[in-house]
């Protein structure tokens, strides 16, 4: 980890810069797989499953029998945890329901919005380095609450052609409609274009490696919407002298173990805390099963000493982290100054793990600085707002002349005429 003390503001842009990901070399490979899936459907998906996941599949669909079998394999302890997490996620997202109001913008002109669920959504759940069953809950629960009619889930099988039981259990709890054994680019292509087995969806959600991210971005250009652009996972932790170094180190390592390219950004106003956390990270790292991955991630990370909390929050807002932990005495006041972050964790007891699993907030968040302009997944991610307007004769009298004048000045005569005819009909 790189230690930086009292950096000048002119250095901040370089400090917050993420490792550059050159996906140009991936694009040709990704496009080739997408084209193959588009043209050859299930046959292409099965071929790539055999090539990449070493699974020979007779069928892509997960059966009811497989879901029932998975239910028997999941421990009661994990089932209880999944139900608790689902309850909290549902409660938080239920509170986000939109209530549109009719607004009379002037006499005779009424406007309103209606929230309508996206009918078909696709969820991608990676297999990769860990079975992300928590992401099933995060993506499927709000989709169900929003009222999406079809919730399609794709996830890679193991070599025996089986899907991780916890993923299937989470899918059942959250109300997923259909589950398919497909991973990587081929899964994104199947949901974007549709195959004989996999329905075409209108929007794709979910994390993945560089190939999956490149595939999502490519299909989003023409064929389907996606949740957001994404990069490697990251955390920023702001600490003062009241922070618990043991907790802080654990939080930083929980991010570092996500992947080799994850990033940790630690900002503190206390040199003692910086040194204490640094030592604690080194001690706790030795106990981790994913030590090598966490160590590689820490090599890309920065420990920064700043002069005061105002500078700390300004630097953090410049960084725009996916996760932000504020472990300071006045965390509530600092929280008011956060303008760029995906999800914020306040105080010594609000660890990132809580939000990753069971507090109720969504863990699908903007990374790689995208928090400057994007928010994380929420109920609105699964809805569209359709606007309505109704005009009476009085409304025509009130805005008709203005509409005609504006249309004429934009040299759109047909627009002007559509209103002009209505104005004349009232005279």
Regions found by a protein language model. Name each.
Residues 1-119:
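N-terminal Rossmann-like NAD(P)+-binding subdomain of aldehyde/semialdehyde dehydrogenases
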Residues 2-8, 178-183, 303-308:
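Short acidic-hydrophobic, aromatic-tinged amphipathic segments that line or gate anion-handling sites
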Residues 98-103, 225, 262-267, 287-297, ...:
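Flexible, glycine/charged-enriched surface loops at secondary-structure junctions
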Residues 103-169:
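Conserved small-residue-rich beta-alpha loop and adjacent elements
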Residues 175-263:
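Conserved NAD(P)+-binding/catalytic subdomain of aldehyde/semialdehyde dehydrogenases
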Residues 258, 266-337, 341:
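A glycine- and small/hydrophobic-rich beta-loop-beta segment
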Residues 318-427:
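C-terminal core of ALDH-fold dehydrogenases
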């Amino acid at each position: 980890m790189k230690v930086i003390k009292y950096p000048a503001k002119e250095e901040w842009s370089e400090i917050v810069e993420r490792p550059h990901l050159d996906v140009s070399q991936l694009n040709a490979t990704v496009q080739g797989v997408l084209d193959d899936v588009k043209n050859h459907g299930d046959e292409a998906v099965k071929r790539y499953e055999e090539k990449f996941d070493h699974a020979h599949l007779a069928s892509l669909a997960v059966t009811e029998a497989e879901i029932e079998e998975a239910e028997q394999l999941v421990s009661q302890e994990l089932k209880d945890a999944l139900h608790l997490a689902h309850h909290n996620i549902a409660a938080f997202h239920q509170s986000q329901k939109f209530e549109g109001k009719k607004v009379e913008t002037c006499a005779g002109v009424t406007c309103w919005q209606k929230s309508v669920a996206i009918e078909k959504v696709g969820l991608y759940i990676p297999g990769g380095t860990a079975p992300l069953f928590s992401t099933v809950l995060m993506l499927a629960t709000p989709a169900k609450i929003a009222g999406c009619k079809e919730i399609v889930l794709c996830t890679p099988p193991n070599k025996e052609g089986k899907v991780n039981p916890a993923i299937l259990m989470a899918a059942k709890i959250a109300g997923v409609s259909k589950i398919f054994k497909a991973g990587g680019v081929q899964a994104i292509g199947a949901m974007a274009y549709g195959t004989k087995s996999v329905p075409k969806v209108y929007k794709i959600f979910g994390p993945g490696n560089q190939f999956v991210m490149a595939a999502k971005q490519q299909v989003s250009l023409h064929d389907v919407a996606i949740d957001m652009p994404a990069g490697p996972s990251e955390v920023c932790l702001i600490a003062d002298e009241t922070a618990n170094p043991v907790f802080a180190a654990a939080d930083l390592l929980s991010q570092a173990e996500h992947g080799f390219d994850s990033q940790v950004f630690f900002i503190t106003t206390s040199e003692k805390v910086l040194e204490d956390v640094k030592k604690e990270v080194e001690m706790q790292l030795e106990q981790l099963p994913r030590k090598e991955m966490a160590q590689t991630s820490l090599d890309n990370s920065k420990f920064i000493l700043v002069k005061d909390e105002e500078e700390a929050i300004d630097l953090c807002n410049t960084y725009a982290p996916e996760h932000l932990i504020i472990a300071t005495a006045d965390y509530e006041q600092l929280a008011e100054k956060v303008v760029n972050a995906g999800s914020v964790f306040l105080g010594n007891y609000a660890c990132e793990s809580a939000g990753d699993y069971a507090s109720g907030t969504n863990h699908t968040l903007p990374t790689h600085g995208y928090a400057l302009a994007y928010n994380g997944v929420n109920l609105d991610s699964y809805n569209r707002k359709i606007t309505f307007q109704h005009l009476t004769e009085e409304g025509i009298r009130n805005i008709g002349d203005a509409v005609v004048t504006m249309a004429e000045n934009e040299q759109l005569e047909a627009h002007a005429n559509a209103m002009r005819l209505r104005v004349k009909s009232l005279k």
